[in-house]
Amino acid sequence: PFAAFIAQKLNLPMTYIRKEKKKFGKNSQIEGLLSQKDHVLLAEDLMTDGGSKLKFLDAIDKSGANISGIFVIFNYGIIKDYYLFKKKKIDVIFLTNWSDVLSVASRKKILKYEEVEIVESFLENMKIKS
């Protein structure tokens, strides 16, 4: 997973968290060590509506560890659960989103103006914050 690259680069331990507990083996949702003193940065490649992130955060909460924030490469901008993160005072940091991608695609003429408008209209109709 993407988190492994971050952990290796920063020389920090990595813990793997599943969306749900395994039905076999140790029957655990968390693989690796996680203690009450630990500070956790949840690192993922994508964030759609944040639903799976909430499951991960619940597992981290149950372990007693502290959640420092969520880092994703691409945020789709579906804001269904965004306010839950804000309410829990958890920062969501992302490298890019639809707005950035469309801006670069337009500036570099990868997409025509009309094509960018079509995508933006679609995103607006889907209530996706770009």
What kind of region is each of these model predictions?
Residues 18, 44, 96:
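Short beta->alpha connector loops at strand-helix junctions that form conserved
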Residues 58-130:
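PRPP-dependent phosphoribosyltransferase catalytic core
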Residues 1-3, 78-79:
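Short, well-ordered alpha-helical microsegments
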Residues 2-40, 49-54:
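Short, glycine/charge-rich flexible loops or terminal/linker lids adjacent to PRPP-binding catalytic cores
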Residues 33-75:
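A contiguous pocket-lining binding segment that forms or flanks enzyme active sites
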